[in-house]
Each structure stands twice: as C-alpha cells, then as structure tokens.
C-alpha cells in the first residue's frame, strides 16, 4: 500500500503538549520583566479611561498563605481583564508595616527591654525583610504590578501623609480625647480596634450577688408597702466577679416588672419573669409580695457588698430578661453600656473607679484584692461575697467571649484616656461622621450585594473610633497638650504639618526624638508632648489619602477615589470600615466606588484550614508541583462570594480542566501550520457555512465573557471557556473539520476557510484566558501566526470576530438543530461500537429517517452531511419509510439506522467508499482523494 502521508496537511506545532508549568513559568516572569511589561502598559494607557483597584495591604509578617493567593489572584484577574477591555488599570501593591505583631516579634527575638528607638529600628528592618519574601511569592503567582515601587505604610512619605490625614480630621473637629471603655489586651498592653477582636469559647464563673438596701423606706414605697420587716437585697448576676470591686451602680429596665420576693430571711428584688428560675438556682423557697415597674426603683440606693459606698439604681434600656436576674451591676470603667449610663446620670470622669492596671493587675491600694491578677482574683472575690452573706449562687458556664486576635487571650473593656474619632460629634461643617458614612454606603456598589447591609449595620451601631495606642512601632499622634488645661495646642494643625515635613525626611523617629522646644520655643514648658501611636487600621485606612492622591497618583481627576476595593469578607469591619471613615471625614465621600468581598478558604469538607487538622494547602507547594496557572484556574473556577473550597483533589480537577483547555489551544495552533494571516485569511462571505458559524459562536461567547469579566463572575468565564473547548469545539466543530483540514488541498478554499476560523478563534481564546491563565496565554501568544505585540497583555479584546447574519440559510438556529441531530447520531454510533457492530465512526453508514421539515433542513447540506456526522455515508429518507429496526432518537421526528459499510476503506481519508479501487494508479484511494491530490481539488460549501 502506498504511503500517502506526504499528501496530507497534518497538524504541526512546537507548542508543547506537556505544560511543564513549574519550569516554564519563571521564564515568562523573566520575559515580562525584560520587556518592562508593566511600564509599557502605563506608557500606552495615557489616552485610555482609568480603572483603579486599590490594593488592601497585607501585613508584613510571615509567609503568604492560600488566602493571600486567592486575594492577589482575584485582583490580578481584574486588572488584566480591565487592561484587555481597553482601560489603563495600574496596580500598586502595598504592605501594612506598623503594629503590635511586628513589635511583638522583635521583642520575642531581642527582648522586651530594648530602648524604644532600637525597637523601631529593628521593627523597620524586620518588616522590610518580610516584604521581600512576600513580594517574591506574589510575583511568582503571576501578579502584574508596580513591584519595583510598592507602597509601604512605613515609608517616610506615607508616615508623613498619615499625620497630614489626621491633621485634616483634627481641623474638621472630629478628634477628641476622652475616657472610655475600650477593648484592652493585657498582653498587648494596649487598646484594640474592633477588627482586632475575635470570639472564642471561655469557661467563666457566674455569680448571683445581693446588694443590701440602704434606702429601705424608698424601696418599700416603690413596691407600695408601708415598710420592710426584714433585710432586703437587690440581686445581680454576672460572669465577671472581678468587676464587683469597681461596681458603682445597678441598672434596671424602666418597663420591666420587678418583684419583691419574700425568701425567708430576707427580701430579694428580682425581675418578675425570672423569679422562678432564680429561686431554683438559689435553692430557696419564695413568694412574690409586691411588684413595681423598673422606673419606680430609680435612684434608690443600695450598699456595696464589701466596700463602704452606695450603688444607686439607674435606668437602662439594654437590660434584658434572657439570663440572670433582670438587674445588671454597673462598673463604668469596665463596660461600655455601664459607662454611658453612669455618664448620663452625671458621673464625672474623676468619679469613675478604675482599679485594674494595664497589665490586668489590681492597684496595690485596692482593699482585699490589691496586687492580684483579675482572672486569679475571681475566686477570691467569690469567697469575699460568701463571707459577707451576699453570694446567692455560684456556677460556671461556657460562653463566647472576646479574645485578642494575636495572643488568643481574653480581653476586657477598660476605661482609659484615649484619642477618639467621634462618630456623632458635630464637625465644624456638615454632617456627623456616622451620617456621612451611612450616606456614602448608599452610593457604593457591593459585590455581593449583602455586603451593603453588613457594613451599614456595623457603621450604624459602632462606638467612637479609638485611634490611639500605647506602643512604640507606629505612626505618632503628634500632639502637644497644655499641662494645666489638658487642651490641644491652639496651633496643632500647623504644628502637625511641621512634624510631617520632618517625618518625610527622617521617618517617625523624627517625632520621638523631637524636643518640644524645637517647635514650641518658650511655650514648651507649658505643654506635654504625647507619645501615643495611631491604630494600625488608621495606617491602612488612610492609604487612599497617600497612594491615590500622593505617592503614586493613580486616582481619578475627580479626587482620590478607587474604582474597587477587594478583600476578604472580614474587612467589612477592617479595611473597608476604616477607609470609609477616614474618606468621609476628610473628603466627605467613600474612597471607593465598589466593594468586592470574597470568602475564606476551607477544605473540601467545609472545615477551616488548620495545621492541626493537616488540611492546609501551601501555595508555594502547589506552584512547585502543578504551576501557578493551576492555582489561578482554581481561583477563577470558584464562586468566591462564599467559602472557597480547596484540597489536593480539587486542585487536581483544575489541572485536568487546564489540560483540556491547553490541548484545545494546541490543536488550534497545530492546524494553523503554514497559515499566513496576511495572505491566507478569507473574508466571512468566502468562508464555508460551518466555519462562519464557529466564528459567530466565538463572537457570542466573547460578549458573554466580557460581561462576566465586567461583573467579576470569573467562575462563569471559566465554565464558558471550558465548555466551549469541550462541547462546541472538541465535541463538534474540531472533529468535523479534521477531514477537510487534513485531506483537501493545502491552499484550497476549503482548508483556508477552516484555518481562518481557527485563527479567529485562537486570537479570541488566547485573550479570554489571559487574565486567568496568565502564563499559558503568554506562551500561546508567541506561537500564533502573524505580526503582533510583544505580549498578549499589550492587546485588547479581539475585534476580528464576525457575526453570522440572521437571514442566511444556514443560520444559528440551523446549526443548533444540526448539533442536536449529530448528538443523536453519536449516541447510536456509541451503542453500535459497544455492540461490536461497527469499529470506528467511518466504518458506519447512517440513514436518517426524518419528518418532512427536518429532512428538508438536513438536505441543505447535500452530500456534505456525512462530513458533519463523520460517517462514510449519510442518507436521508422519509420518517414514514423507517424500518422496524430503526431506533428512536431524542430529536423529535427522527429515527436512525446505522450499518457497517461493505465498501473498501480509503488509505488516505479512511472513509469507506464505493469508488475505492477504481483508479489504476491509486487503487487504495477514493475518488475524492484522487481529486485532491491530482485534480483541482474537491469543492466544499458547507462543512
């Protein structure tokens, strides 16, 4: 038999089948760096509309984890897709550099007794070292950005501008000093922001404590009695015995009914609804003697159980009946509600008792408990209450309690003198900060939409923002306070600018080493220079002030507003929150137009990632084994709005999907062998009908993909691209064109038509995948024929796809019908192969018994129907002529019969045809193949 291989147009490409991503991706990174890709994008972006995604800074401590990878990949997909959509989309990565975790790390390594300036020096060095490690990992993920010039909150200019941002807020009168309970961590020795608090289960003692009545006559009158004939106690329930020494009041709800209960040796005042449960807890019998509304008990005095002072009854709406006694003991220094209630009743700051020091130890002067750590003092307080006859019950409970997110230790509320940004404080002009922020939320688009209600609820209910910390490694609050009055220097804003100019040159050390006389002259003796530092959420929360209008100037002409902030859903109470407050305080609007949140990573069973569970996925390991593009494809394929599942099995599925996309792309490239777009590209009207349909299908898909990218539905992009490769291309079009591509003349219209379609599809596909499969798209780009830009990222969405007119005979609807018929034929061919009735599809002859309308439609393909069905023969017949052994199909009005061909197999095209052997010189070939190698070539019109 003659070998006709040389007469075929066999696919050929140097594009490798095996991706080898871990080895090949670093070469692409070097290529991007060598050509200065990011800089070139900025150079061509001048005339483009701008899209700014402002990077929420990760903390400069530790290696990146899978959550970091998700976040950075999502951002990169957006930046790349916006670039391809014709935007100038700069991406300036940033880092959060100040704060306790770094200071704690330095103290752990070098000891706690370092001089403050040395601590700051070592913190700066440590943060810089951590940034370099994280930066290398982010770059390895394929994230395109200004890596040579990222923003860092510890850069001198950033530190200076943070002071300027604070000055703006001082100028507008948002900042004040106050004594308030704040979240306090003994291990940090500092106040914590709301976002630094997490909740965990804690075992706590619960006690019911009786406070003896001091105003017995008033209590009797409140209950409508002439007098009391035995001692009386009002009973509180608490889970914090350590706060009893600081008790200064008792709170009742004005509308709750309270009962005077005769409990034998004494009267007890309890909420009427809780009498039964309380008596059961006390193991006592009792009888309700009288009832009264809470408002009747207002200002009645009771005695502290073991100190010689009174505790008056105050009315408070927050008192509830879900647990306890219906009476809340009030220690204004250690509870926010308690604090505000006592202030409402006229208690001054000087009157508030605060016996717990910053390290959690009672002051030495506190009777009975001085010098004791509060958690260890709990049993001693209980014992004292029992000793004085005020302990009615003592139990333990497990409950959710606030903990430090760094040390995982319990927190307390503690009233300290701190600097605050007032939420409801009236500024010099305009609405309060809370009003501004709530209004700004209505002007912001949230993805997903539920984020709006979440952030609104947090802003609506949050307290004033405590912005001061008592630490070394942080941006200073450069205030001078008058020693006598405690007031800020009248030139504070002006002085802050002078400090900012110094910090710009020397960093935060400029403030800490500053002698007040350098700025205040002779006034210095009258002022104290404070050494508090700013909350790190103020650092990151003012990056819009520095980055968008300052160091990188990537904001819009309208001001420092980013189009998008994108972070994990925890940032509703973190970076989204603090940025909103600073933006509204300084500029009276949010610093972002859209907020996009993603969920947290979990394993395939929905469990949190944990080293103890052994279910963590390390991004560096995935990159080294599978490649960054597999990680990127996994991120894109997941609906990030909820929890994001990841495991080795899930990543392997992503690798399998990647392989299908890569193989499809390789097929396109290999069949463009010898194609010159400059000379061989056919206009749409000269292309075969099937090829026009394929290009049209790509056009429709591109519109859907562009929309999905615009709406950040990357999982839709993934599914559409994958399905296109598997179904429309792999399952239909590419199979059909193989015969034409391989067997017709190399320069024939039939072949150039399908190559034109393949070229257009490849040009579009490489762009579709570029935001997600960044490395692979760049590799594909180099193998595409024709002149092109150095990088796919220097292109925009492909505009060479043509639409199939609705009025052509073989329109979209027509090919949808043909696809359904082909699927039905394929199913029957599979059945016949399984039954060993036929071998390959080309060994089959199929007869389609169709109702008249369908038969007329299929007849439009003429003798090319067999090429669409990939059978050696395809015959149409009326449905009424179907024999008994014809099988039904899923297509209405269609029955099928498949038989094994009795004809010889062509040695070139492998079709079984009756004319094989009729040519003396080529006895192994069919007439069609002889025409293609010796004649003018077969003519195709449709497929």
From Swiss-Prot:
Q: Which InterPro entries does the record cross-reference, listed alphabetically?
A: aa-tRNA-synth_I_CS, aa-tRNA-synth_Ia, Anticodon_Ile_BEm, Ile-tRNA-ligase, Ile-tRNA-ligase_type1, Ile-tRNA_ligase, M/V/L/I-tRNA-synth_anticd-bd, Rossmann-like_a/b/a_fold
S-S pairs: none
UniProt motif 'KMSKS' region: location: 608-612
Q: What is its main location?
A: cytoplasm
Protein origin, superkingdom: Bacteria
Q: Which UniProt keywords apply?
A: Aminoacyl-tRNA synthetase, ATP-binding, Cytoplasm, Ligase, Metal-binding, Nucleotide-binding, Protein biosynthesis, Zinc
Protein name per Swiss-Prot or TrEMBL: Isoleucine--tRNA ligase
């Amino acid at each position: 038999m003659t070998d006709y291989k040389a007469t075929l147009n066999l696919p050929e490409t140097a594009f490798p089948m095996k991706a080898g991503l871990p080895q090949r991706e670093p070469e692409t990174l070097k290529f991007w760096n060598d050509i200065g890709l990011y800089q070139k994008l900025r150079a061509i972006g001048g005339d483009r509309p701008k899209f700014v995604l402002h990077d929420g800074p990760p903390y400069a401590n530790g290696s990146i984890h899978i959550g970091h990878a998700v976040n950075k990949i999502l951002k990169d997909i957006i930046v790349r897709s916006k670039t391809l959509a014709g935007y100038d989309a700069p991406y300036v990565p940033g880092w959060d550099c100040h704060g306790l975790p770094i200071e704690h790390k330095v103290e752990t390594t070098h000891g706690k007794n370092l001089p403050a300036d040395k601590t700051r020096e070592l913190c700066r060095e440590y943060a810089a070292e951590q940034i370099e490690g994280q930066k290398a990992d982010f770059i390895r993920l394929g994230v395109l950005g200004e890596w040579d010039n990222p923003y860092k909150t510890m850069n001198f200019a950033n530190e200076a501008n943070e002071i300027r941002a604070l000055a703006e807020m001082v100028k507008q009168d948002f900042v004040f000093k106050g004594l308030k309970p704040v979240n306090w961590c003994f291990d940090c020795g500092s106040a914590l922001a709301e976002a630094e608090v997490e909740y965990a289960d804690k075992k706590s003692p619960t006690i019911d404590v009786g406070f003896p009545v001091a105003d017995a006559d008033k209590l009797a009158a409140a209950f409508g009695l002439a007098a009391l004939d035995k001692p009386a106690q009002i009973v509180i329930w608490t889970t914090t015995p350590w706060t009893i020494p600081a008790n200064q009041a008792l709170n009742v709800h004005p509308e709750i009914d309270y009962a005077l209960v005769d409990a034998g040796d004494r009267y007890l005042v309890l909420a009427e609804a809780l009498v039964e449960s309380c008596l059961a807890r006390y193991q006592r019998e009792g009888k309700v003697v009288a009832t009264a509304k809470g408002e009747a008990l207002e200002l009645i005095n009771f005695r502290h159980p073991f100190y010689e002072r009174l505790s008056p009854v105050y009315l408070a709406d927050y008192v509830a009946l879900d647990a306890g006694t219906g009476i809340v003991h009030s220690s204004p220094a250690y509870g926010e509600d308690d604090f505000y209630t006592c202030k409402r009743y006229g208690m001054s700051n000087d009157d508030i008792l605060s016996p717990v020091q910053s390290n959690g130890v009672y002051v030495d002067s506190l009777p009975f408990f001085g010098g004791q750590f509060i958690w260890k003092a709990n049993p001693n307080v209980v014992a004292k209450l029992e000793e004085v006859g005020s302990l009615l019950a003592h139990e333990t409970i497990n409950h959710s309690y606030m903990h430090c997110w760094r040390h995982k230790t319990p927190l307390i509320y503690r009233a300290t003198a701190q600097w605050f940004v007032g939420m409801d404080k009236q500024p010099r002009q305009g609405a309060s900060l809370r009003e501004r922020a709530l209004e700004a939320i209505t002007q912001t688009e949230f993805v997903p939409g539920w984020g709006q209600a979440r952030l609104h609820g947090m802003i609506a209910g949050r307290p004033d923002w405590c912005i001061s910390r008592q630490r070394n490694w942080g941006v200073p609050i450069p205030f001078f306070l008058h020693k006598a009055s405690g007031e800020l220097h009248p030139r504070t804003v002006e002085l802050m600018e002078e400090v900012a100019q110094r910090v710009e040159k020397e960093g935060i050390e400029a403030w800490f080493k500053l002698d007040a006389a350098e700025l205040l002259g002779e006034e210095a003796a009258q002022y104290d220079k404070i050494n508090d530092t700013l909350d790190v959420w103020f650092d990151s929360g003012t990056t819009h002030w520095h980055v968008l209008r300052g160091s990188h100037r990537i904001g819009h002409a309208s001001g420092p507003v980013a189009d998008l902030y994108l972070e994990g859903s925890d940032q509703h109470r973190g970076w989204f929150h603090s940025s909103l407050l600073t933006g509204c305080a300084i500029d009276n609007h949010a610093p972002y137009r859209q907020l996009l949140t993603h969920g947290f990573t979990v394993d395939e069973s929905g469990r949190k990632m944990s080293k103890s569970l052994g279910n963590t996925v390390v991004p560096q390991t995935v990159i080294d084994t599978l490649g960054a593009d597999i990680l990127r494809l996994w991120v894109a394929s997941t609906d990030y709005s909820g929890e994001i599942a990841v495991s080795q099995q899930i990543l392997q599925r992503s690798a399998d999907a990647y392989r299908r996309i890569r193989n499809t792309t390789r097929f396109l490239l290999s069949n463009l062998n010898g194609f010159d777009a400059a000379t061989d590209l056919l206009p749409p009207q000269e292309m075969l009908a099937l090829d026009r349909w394929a290009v049209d299908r790509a056009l429709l898909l591109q519109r859907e993909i562009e929309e999905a990218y615009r709406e950040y539905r990357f999982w839709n992009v993934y599914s559409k691209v994958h399905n296109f490769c598997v179904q429309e291309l792999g399952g239909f079009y590419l199979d059909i064109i193989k015969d034409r591509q391989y067997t017709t003349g190399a320069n024939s219209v039939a072949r150039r038509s399908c190559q034109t379609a393949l070229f257009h599809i490849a040009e579009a596909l490489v762009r579709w995948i570029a935001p997600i499969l960044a490395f692979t798209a760049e590799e594909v780009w180099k193998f595409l024929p024709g002149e092109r830009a150095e990088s796919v990222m220097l292109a925009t969405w492909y505009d060479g796809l043509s639409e199939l007119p609705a009025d052509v005979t073989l329109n979209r609807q027509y090919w949808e019908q043909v696809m359904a018929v082909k699927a039905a034929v394929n199913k029957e061919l599979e059945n016949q192969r399984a039954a060993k009735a036929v071998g390959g599809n080309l060994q089959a002859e199929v007869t389609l018994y169709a109702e008249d309308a369908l038969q007329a439609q299929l007849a439009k393909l003429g003798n090319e129907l067999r090429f669409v069905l990939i059978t050696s023969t395809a015959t149409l017949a009326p449905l009424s002529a179907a024999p008994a052994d014809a099988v039904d199909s899923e297509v209405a009005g269609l029955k099928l019969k498949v038989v094994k061909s009795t004809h010889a197999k062509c040695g070139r095209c492998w079709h079984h045809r009756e004319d094989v052997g009729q040519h003396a010189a080529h006895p192994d070939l069919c007439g069609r193949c002889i025409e293609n190698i010796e004649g003018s070539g077969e003519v195709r019109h449709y497929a």
